[in-house]
Amino acid sequence: MVKNKGKKLFSDSIQLEGHQGEINTGKFSHNGEYFCSAGNDKTINIWEVFDKKCQNVNSIIHAHSSPILEIAWSNDDDYIASCSVDKRVTLWDIYNGNYIIKYKEHDNFVYSIDFCDNLICSVGEDCSLIINDIRMKTKSNSYQHKYQLTTCKFSDNNNIFFGGIDNQIYKYDIKKGQIDKNFILIGHNDTITGLDISHNNKYLLSNSMDNSLIIWDIQKTGNNLSKKLMGNKHGPEKNLLRCKWNNDDTLVSCGSADKIVHIWDVKLGCIIKNIYGHNGSVNEVDFNSLVPNIISSVSNDNTSIIGYF
């Protein structure tokens, strides 16, 4: 086990307790210093990762009126955006816990959210992709799909990948205000629940209720499917299980209903590590940018775990 000499956890595995319900989302800040979690108790918790006790430094109680389904950090880590069953997307100041803007453009549950520069994208039950510029109080762009959308991810500040219950992944060009009809990724057999872009911006990772992860080469035209990974599980509760690349794009991980954090070696195409500790579905995982062999996980068991792997 190789640890960063400058930063280290106070224990090899830390269980964070502070939520009173299932945790749906949990992400490290871009600088790796903080961890944010949120879920069915409508609370957003922020933890200082390398503090002697991994201290909870801020709790935003009743951040939404219904369960929170996903959060996203701004590029500078000064803000967090959250989306909820209450149909709202909210932008928060992490230092004082106050909301800055509440966006109310969605007509139903908002399932997924992502942040890039000044833009926030969100998708939901109303079949819409909505893009908000945090410098404005009204939406800057939107796209109406035929089916419910469950996940979205910026690849840069001009393109957004999104997917939903039609099992396909689409690319939306922000400047053109339309999807690329020549770029539709087909390969999953059930709802897409999570997306993540590799750090080199060459590959897209997707998680699906068909119990597979797919790595797509998004620089190719034609057959984009690069590799299919198996081993994760989706349960009858149909949680939106998210997925993640590690810092150097050699490993991937994802949420899994079997209570296990699975880590795949991308080159080998197989699971190289299983991490146990949760008593419920693992809904989201994240790799720490500051110390590459630290991973986080959040679960239906009301806890988050941060530890070395």
Question: Which positions does each model-derived feature cover?
Answer:
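Blade-level signature of beta-propeller repeat domains, shared across WD40, Kelch, NHL, RCC1
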Residues: 283-309
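Intrinsically disordered, low-complexity acidic/Ser/Thr/Pro-rich linker and tail segments
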Residues: 1-20, 25
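Short coil/turn segments that connect the beta-strands within blades of beta-propeller domains
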Residues: 31-33, 76-78, 117-118, 157-158, ...
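Canonical WD40 repeat/beta-propeller blade segments in eukaryotic WD-repeat proteins
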Residues: 21-27, 66-73, 108-115, 146-155, ...
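Conserved strand-to-loop turn within each blade of WD40 beta-propeller repeats
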Residues: 37-41, 82-86, 123-126, 163-166, ...
